[in-house]
Amino acid sequence: MKLPQTGGCQCGKIRYEITEAPQLVYTCHCTDCQRLTSSAFSMGVVVAETAFHLSGSEPRPLQRTADSGRTNTRLVCPECGSWVCGTPRDGVVRVRAGTLDDTSWLRPTRHIWTRSKQPWITLPQGDEIFEVSDPRR
């Protein structure tokens, strides 16, 4: 993986730069992520808040109470509606992997909310697998 990594929303009004290697790449199989992405799971990249730099349009915050009971705030483009990332929490930002300009290096190693995963999905042996949320995050 080459640094910095860049990305943004579908219309290009929001852009970002990641200046440090990510701490983690993960998949989330919760029903909210399935609905939000119209897919079987979402994929996120966890980066230090200090290494994530937004530019362009101001993202619009959307809040929702997750299956865990925690309120999550998604930052979306006010123009195209792309879900770019979450608000910073605990010193990190969870960036939506599909918004990266280069996704060739992505390899998730942690899978959360697998009790809701689609039955046809097989998770790799050796990866960290949690039926619900990762208790460390």
Model-derived features with residue positions:
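A short Gly-Trp-Pro
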Residues: 1-137
